[in-house]
Amino acid sequence: MILLNMNLQEFKQKYNYDVATKMMQQYLDIKFAHLDCLLLFRMGDFYEMFYEDATIASKVLGIALTKRGKNGEEEIPMCGIPYHALENYLTKLIKENHKIAICDQLETPEEAKNKGGYKAVVSRDVTRIITPGTIIEENFIASDEPNYLASLVIPQNKETASLCYVDLSTSEIFVVNVPEAEILNELARLKPREILLSENLRSSNLADNIFKQLNFRITYQVDSFFAVNKCEKIILDFYKMKDIKGIGEISSGQICTIGSILEYLSLTQKQNIPHLPIPRIINFHSYMAIDVATRRNLEIVTNSQGGSKGSVLSTINHTVTKQGGRLLYNFLSSPLTDITKINQRLNITDFFYSNPAIVSKIREYLKRISDIERCLTRITMNRSSGHDLLSIKYTLETATIIKGVFFDVYGVNLPDFIEKIIKPLTGNEELYNLIEATIREDAPHNLNEGGIIKHEYHPKVAQLHDLINNGKLHIEKLRDQYRKETGIDSLKICHNNVIGLFIDITAKNANKITDPKFIHRQTTVNSVRYTTNELQKLESNLVNAKTLVISLEKALYADICRQVIVKSSYLRMLAISLSRLDVFCNFAYVADEYDYVKPEFTNDLSFNIVKGRHPVVEKALQRESKSFVYNDCRLSEFERIWLITGPNMAGKSTFLRQNAIIAIMAQIGSFVPAKSAKIGVVDKIFSRIGAADDLIKGQSTFMAEMLETSAILAQSTKNSLIILDEVGRGTSTYDGVSIAWSVLEYIHDKLKCRCLFATHYHELTFMSNFLPALQNYTIAIEELGKDILFLHNIISGAADRSYGIHVAALAGLPASVINRAEQILLKFEKTSTIKGKNILSTESNNFSLFNLKPNKTTISNKLYAKFRTIDPDKLSPKEALELIYELKKMV
């Protein structure tokens, strides 16, 4: 790829500019202005790419890489795609995160020759730049999730970053200030397709993490692109304001992000930007903080491979509209933290849950509506078709019907919160009538085909279509008129490619033509040919009718679109209302279908889930005709930490995840998979469940685990929910136990937040003796001879052994390996020589892992009490050895 910092002289030298053809010089001039793009250069019926662009595109598109002559001594690599198949190929390029410049011909070859002679080069220029963050076409973007372009600015103090993000396809724009430590987490929430960054951040850790952890496309701009004075002027000009305070109370960093996004849109869309509302200022703390690892671990909107199957979203998404799907996606990505707003959403869900008949009707009607948000954007950017206007018309019609459903049932007694949602569903009959009167039901997608405007809307349109559809009848009518005038019954009107339409009369009847309006054109052996002004006019009308009607229809269509754009604010409110109806009806439908319950919220540290289930796992089991084993979770101010032990495959990780997911579902306004749920609002959720070596970043499993754990301890607050699974397992046993122990102490004593902590280190269960807010729980199992049965129930108590060999057998290890493992285990149980270490004690509330001071005056009592608690048959080899060391240390 061409180096972006190459100057013009270097560029021309590299590509032999001075000896290139005029056409290739034109290409190179345009390419130099778009070095960061793949340039698609229109050549007749093809878009062609040259040099490095051709090499890249041929691989991505799977098309042949050929050559187009030589430039000096160098052959020019080239590939091309048919212009009519452009969209299909663009989809592939966009998927690979390429930035594409479309260079079109601005005149025909004939027009070029008329201006500059037969060697003239057709005028060309870039008409549009397509980037992952600026796409609006439905073929290129997912219909059920947003497509954000973001701009990120980090001020000098680096304490707070500013972030602006816009979805061009729906004309939504937001701005937020984000603590520096939360930048990656906020980007993970938004999942922008493209991020604008200053060049001075190119080599920063932030840019490296955005690329490696999130894999988002970064578009770098020169530092001056984000200059505050320049950006402020851009904002004022765009919104036609005199004072930046018209935006609201925004920081200088936010001014830079908004201005840079508007400038980038202007550059890529060639000034053709849709009307964007004033940016909505977002309070970062109004949403639950969920970090990158937690989003991945919980599989909230995507699964661990980046797909949708098996995610929480795929399980609870039964929306029936595209905009409803996007709103649900946004809800799940951004759970609320304001208890008032959460309860408002839950009340709406409860209303629909209590009215299943209304839900059923509304969902059927919602299936008829279109994605008018994106329709409207295409209209404002002059990339629409008649189908977009028809979609708006049908949606307006259906919205009126939907509003009627509510009043049929409730009359004027609707709750205020429902009245507020459905208010925009009516009130624009004028717009409906306009589209109904103008746009044909069979309007084609392509404006150049004509046939968009109803004939009765404009007399000239009717006249031209009459000519197109009934041209033969008009010719026959004129022929009959001339036969009557001349008395020549054999008179014909014919056509050839030389003289066009003409009147044909046999030679013997030529003397009957006396009227001077008949103009002689040609004489042959057997006939004489004439024309008239009337016939020439008819011919001209027939020849030009198609062109004229298309031109007229385009003008009328543009005028109709302008009238629609005037109503854009109303249409956006309508789209929001319909999407909210879809989401809340979806919540009600899912709650009824899957037996979910309305959660109750408090301002304390309650987390009381009765018979909770994992929504995704439950549905997967149901498909196999199996039942999910529900479990309770009862965290509170006085029992904040559950330490959960038990073998692998018993269900610990599922239990951890399901409770985090229940909190998220509850705080988006959804009912939850449980018999009852009482939750103190969670401000942040952190999970560390499993880890893999991050080879790209050169990090081991243990380093990745420690980094995640460190971030959790640094960012959690008293109102957070922490989910930890097997902390410390990536290192030696004693190091691992020590780390897990101290992490638990820190959470208990310093953070004082709710935590579910799963571990294989049974030594940690003794901490319940001196950490009053920590309680032990385990997974119930049933031993059947040498086999075990996982019951998946969470019960009070601690696991007495790991059952690792049983799990290994279930995993399919060879029988010889299992038998040998059992022999070794038996030997360890009899004569263990594994070194132990005493880290178990219960002697005081001031216990510290590294400060064991036994009280010698109570040794006898302690030994007696200790021996009474020992069951030799239930001790693992490791536990037995550690017990010996403990007893030795006590005496």
UniProtKB/Swiss-Prot annotation:
Residues noted as binding ATP in the record, renumbered to the chain: 646-653
Gene3D superfamilies: 1.10.1420.10, 6.10.140.430, DNA repair protein MutS, domain I, MutS, connector domain, P-loop containing nucleotide triphosphate hydrolases
Keyword terms, alphabetized: ATP-binding, DNA damage, DNA repair, DNA-binding, Nucleotide-binding
InterPro entries: DNA_mismatch_repair_MutS, DNA_mismatch_repair_MutS-lik_N, DNA_mismatch_repair_MutS/MSH, DNA_mismatch_repair_MutS_C, DNA_mismatch_repair_MutS_clamp, DNA_mismatch_repair_MutS_core, DNA_mismatch_repair_MutS_N, DNA_mismatch_repair_MutS_sf
Xref: Pfam families: MutS_I (PF01624), MutS_II (PF05188), MutS_III (PF05192), MutS_IV (PF05190), MutS_V (PF00488)
GO molecular function ontology, one term from the record: ATP-dependent DNA damage sensor activity
Biological process annotations from GO: mismatch repair
Function: This protein is involved in the repair of mismatches in DNA. It is possible that it carries out the mismatch recognition step. This protein has a weak ATPase activity.
Family the entry assigns: Belongs to the DNA mismatch repair MutS family.
Protein name according to UniProt: DNA mismatch repair protein MutS
Gene name linked to the record: mutS
